[in-house]
Regions:
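Short, well-formed alpha-helical segments that are part of the catalytic scaffolds
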Residues: 162-171
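Cell-envelope/extracellular polymer assembly enzymes that use nucleotide-activated donors
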Residues: 72, 151-156
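A recurrent flexible, glycine/aromatic-enriched loop bordering the glycosyltransferase active site
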Residues: 23-53, 66
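Conserved donor NDP-sugar-binding/catalytic core segment of glycosyltransferases
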Residues: 1-25, 53, 88, 95-97
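Donor nucleotide-sugar recognition loop
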Residues: 59-75, 110
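Catalytic donor-sugar/metal-binding loop of nucleotide-sugar-dependent glycosyltransferases
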Residues: 63-65, 75-95, 99-101, 116-138, ...
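Acyl-group handling in specialized metabolite and lipid biosynthesis
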Residues: 37-43, 103-110
Length: 171
């Protein structure tokens, strides 16, 4: 992926390392790029490589998202990237100790709100009308997309000769 000149962004899988013997724990096998999943939580996090030109184009890191600068830069660079590559190998090992966010993500709660703002601003830049709410799952976000107008919803319930089952489905 790094040899492909068309790739703007590369990210890899990761795990955490624990203790003096550097034991590998909590492997994080990430999916290929999925913007809807990324808007719900920062699944990319570490070992994220971006072309220098792209970092310059988006204006680099922003203090506006203190604690979630990585999430913001990932959102802004993937907005502009033409080709995003996922290397499905664990190439990043995150050291975990008692005081690190690797061991206790909730130790920096302000990061969660900063991430929410980063997603909200991303959606605004993309022209998507939505509200971003903090999820009950720390580090996750719920996106409530606006539904313009009053769209009709059709439901197809295949029930053939079981018409009484239809009543159960619609009441």
């Amino acid at each position: 992926a790094l040899q492909d000149k068309d790739v703007d962004v590369v990210y890899t899988d990761e795990d955490k390392i624990l203790g003096p013997d550097w034991k590998n724990v909590n492997p994080n096998f990430k999916p290929d790029f999925n913007i809807d999943l990324l808007r719900s939580y920062n699944y990319i996090t570490h070992f994220y490589c971006v072309k220098t030109e792209l970092i310059k184009e988006v204006g680099g890191f922003s203090d506006k998202y203190d604690g979630a600068q990585d999430y913001d830069i990932i959102l802004r660079t993937t907005e502009k990237a033409h080709k995003i590559a996922h290397v499905s190998k664990i190439l990043y090992h995150w050291r975990m100790h008692s005081n690190s966010t690797a061991a206790n993500p909730e130790s920096k709660k302000y990061c969660h709100e900063a991430g929410r703002r980063a997603v909200e601003d991303h959606l605004n830049r993309m022209g998507i009308e939505a509200q971003v709410q903090l999820s009950k799952l720390f580090g996750g976000y719920r996106i409530r997309y606006a539904t313009p107008g009053n769209p009709m919803i059709s439901i197809v319930i295949p029930n053939k000769d079981h018409y009484k089952d239809l009543d159960l489905c619609v009441t």
